[in-house]
Amino acid sequence: MVPEMGYLDEQFNQLEELQDESSPNFVEEVVALFLKDSPRLLSNIEQTIGKYPQDFYRLDSLVHQLKGSGSSIGAVRMKNECSVFKAHCNDRNLEGCRRSLQKMKREHATLKQKLESYFQLLRQVGPREHAVNSRK
């Protein structure tokens, strides 16, 4: 459901393939870790822009962490915007970094909402029906 909307890539599908009866909530748990950690990273990026606006090395490092975290669940739009931010760091373009941060925050909020809706729907459908439908 969510992958077709362009928010997630094949990595999300691969995570779903790892989920089985022994770990029926695997994907939701991995996504929950991302949703728990990513707001902290976004906040750290925002604070660094405010306190150390010319420390592009630190900004790049923080965004690299966010990009890796997003990539682990297949958050393609987050990953792409992180790449844009990193390019702004490379160009030492603070305004570009600020604009990109706002886009990352919007993408994160949208992704969070879509993932929460997706997992809520899966809980309503139930694990057996999901397993049967996901193998088609």
Give residue spans per PLM region.
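Two-component system phosphorelay core
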Residues: 1-136
